Amino acid sequence: MKMSIRTPPRLLELAGRSLLRDQALAMSTLEELPTELFPPLFMEAFSRRRCEALKLMVQAWPFRRLPLRPLIKMPCLEAFQAVLDGLDALLTQGVRPRRWKLQVLDLQDVCENFWMVWSEAMAHGCFLNAKRNKKPVQDCPRMRGRQPLTVFVELWLKNRTLDEYLTYLLLWVKQRKDLLHLCCKKLKILGMPFRNIRSILKMVNLDCIQEVEVNCKWVLPILTQFTPYLGHMRNLQKLVLSHMDVSRYVSPEQKKEIVTQFTTQFLKLRCLQKLYMNSVSFLEGHLDQLLSCLKTSLKVLTITNCVLLESDLKHLSQCPSISQLKTLDLSGIRLTNYSLVPLQILLEKVAATLEYLDLDDCGIIDSQVNAILPALSRCFELNTFSFCGNPICMATLENLLSHTIILKNLCVELYPAPRESYGADGTLCWSRFAQIRAELMNRVRDLRHPKRILFCTDYCPDCGNRSFYDLEADQYCC
């Protein structure tokens, strides 16, 4: 009888599970356990809450990294506590286990195939492939060699209080701060009293943070409390600010002082590459203060749904830190009554690098479009261009399309349905819109072979969404 090639790993799996049932499981036994058995048996122990086995397996863990976050999705605080107890034993004992390799406890919420790879290897006997498919261990360069253990975590502060896992972890870290390094690379603040945020930020090494998102309805006095912490995030690469408002109780003098305190922190952010600001009301008339403090060349700049003055646009076009932009998003900024010469200058500056341009809902009208066409037609790296929500006529749209003809890298183009598509009451006339699309289809294909062009309607009063149509007159989405 021919033996199946899956028989050996299956026998190993059964043998390993019998170890988990052994209440007298000893460290010496685990030190002789084949490396390939650890991941599947660890998952088994975690899901079945074999706490004593977990403590010992952590101490004998044969890899440098323990990516625990995917397993925490199984609600089991008791098992999580057992893992930390096992780490305690490692950190406090004088003599380390012979097999100890663990250096990183990874609690980041990232796509993780570690457990999947080893589980499939157990099922199919492909342990060699599992070893080849392991991801390199992520280190924190700042703390290399200073502490025996680094704990990677992502902080999502979205409720009034932390979840039970993070609460327990931070308390555990606080009590062992001299034995390990807590590294947080991503911080997202979606809603929490600032006094709670402050206590958490005091525990984190701010130099480690690379991405910050603040999406709260903060007024300027609260932003003032956050400002000193921002200045210490010297390795910050991405900053997202959303829904920052000016309190009606703040005088113009106070506003200027607070904005100055905030923007001067950017002088310290020498790694910043991506800056996103959405519904940030204090930018009006103060954009120059922020731009003058930028010390790096940005790759991404999005200023959306904000009120800007014409002078703000002028300062933006003169900023030296925007000359290498790959992404520029100014959607939702009303430009109807402004000269677009600053925007023309801005596009000329970034023409060599710009790949994504979004000018949706800027209120750009026919008489303004010509100002930006020469500069737009020189953005040869552009692959996505969105111009929805701007009330232009058919002739202007055709002119715009004729200027983008030479942009060979354009993959996605989004344009508004021209004004002729609507009736006197502002509702879309479907028959007229279909006729216009047919005319545009012939016009565009006479000029070039587009990869994807979509025409969008105004927002639907019922569902609040736009409808998108391609050149073939088929509805794309609503």
Curated annotation (Swiss-Prot):
Pathway: Protein modification; protein ubiquitination. GO terms for biological process: negative regulation of apoptotic process; negative regulation of cell differentiation; negative regulation of DNA-templated transcription; positive regulation of cell population proliferation; proteasome-mediated ubiquitin-dependent protein catabolic process; protein ubiquitination. Signal peptide: none annotated. One of its GO terms (molecular function) is ubiquitin-like ligase-substrate adaptor activity. It comes from the Eukaryota. One of its GO terms (cellular component) is Cul2-RING ubiquitin ligase complex. Transmembrane segments: none annotated. LRR repeats lie at residues 99-126, 181-205, 206-232, 233-268, 269-294, 295-326, 327-347, 351-378, 379-403. Belongs to the PRAME family. Substrate-recognition component of a Cul2-RING (CRL2) E3 ubiquitin-protein ligase complex, which mediates ubiquitination of target proteins, leading to their degradation. The CRL2(PRAMEF9) complex mediates ubiquitination and degradation of truncated MSRB1/SEPX1 selenoproteins produced by failed UGA/Sec decoding. Component of a CRL2 E3 ubiquitin-protein ligase complex, also named ECS (Elongin BC-CUL2/5-SOCS-box protein) complex, composed of CUL2, Elongin BC (ELOB and ELOC), RBX1 and substrate-specific adapter PRAMEF9. This is PRAME family member 9. It comes from Homo sapiens. The lineage of its organism: Eukaryota, Metazoa, Chordata, Craniata, Vertebrata.
